[in-house]
Every structure is written in structure tokens, then in C-alpha cells.
Amino acid sequence: MKPEWLTNLHETVTAEGGAVRVTIIRADGSAPRGVGSAMTVGRAVFTGTIGGGALELTALLAARDLLDGYVAVTEPQWRREVRDFPLGPALGQCCGGFVQLLFETVGEAELRDVPVASSKDMLLARPIKSGQPWRFATHRKDDQEAWPLGVRSHVRKCLSGTRGRDAVLNSDWFIEPVNAPVQALFVYGAGHVGRAVVKTFADF
């Protein structure tokens, strides 16, 4: 499988020399999008969304500020920042909740650790502090001894099917499915209208 966001990340870094991946790692109360929503920001383009509005614009500008100060390196650095965003009057956002965003700078050196394609059930795990690369797991025994116990347990349960594969913050690590979870859609009625509806939604 070739997730769109991985393709976009590779294309942006290749074309522009660097990108920032912005991910919602915590969302309390009313928020425009949930945990795991993300966007890839380049100097000229961005893809994905964290919900639009003032939050997304502020995050977009912050990501481009990081890119302005980015200098290409030969060895991967995996620079990360976590920023808090109360969604109130100060931000000009009326949701009233609270969001925590993870900013990760990815250059050509970091991109060497990132696959282009993935298996259906692949998970991505990494600490929210700088330094360590993205870790990908496709089997319940792909966890590593250096990972916190809670992270290892979560990855194993997700990949064995005993726990849902929702994005989660665990022991200061963020774990998310590489491929967006497939949502079931039940259509009652098998006539021409029902078939047309199924055909329309098949690509979503």
C-alpha cells in the first residue's frame, strides 16, 4: 500500500529539501479535528489538514518558521517540538478546547528512514522528544526492548487485534496507524440508488 501522506512527504522533501509534519497528539474538549490528524508542510505547499481555521493557519506559519531556520544535514537529527494551543479568544478560535501539536522536521537525511509504501496494518511509533527516528512495526513482535513498556504493550495489542488501532500518546511516545482506519458504511437497499451510493463512496 502507498499511503497518500507518505507519498506527499517524500515528494515535498525531494522537491523542497525539507518538510514539517504537524500532528495533533492531544485534543481535549471541543477541537476541529481529533488525535492523529496531520498535515505535511513545505515552504511552498502543504497537504493534509488539522481542521482549518486559526489553529491550522497558526500551525502552518509555525512550521514554515521552522523550515526557514532549517539547515540540511548528512545525518538524521529528527528534530521535534510540542506546542500547546488553547482554542479560545487568544487564538481567535471559538472551539473552547485544547490541542497539543507535534512538529517534526524531516529532511533528506531523515527521509532515508521512511518507507515509501507500507503494509495494511503498519504502525508508526516515535518519542515526542528529538533524536530518535520513526519506528515502523508490522508484526506484534516488532517492538524493541528500548521502547517503554507501555509502548511495547500497546503496539503488540494493536497488531494482534486485541486493541483498536487509534492514534494515541503513550509514555511520551506517539503511536499511530500509517494507513487511515477504514470506516464501515452500511447501505440498506440494493437497488440502482444503493449501487450508485456504494460506487460514489468506494474511493473515500
Residue ranges: model-predicted function:
Residues 1-204:
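Segments forming oxygen-rich coordination pockets for charged ligands
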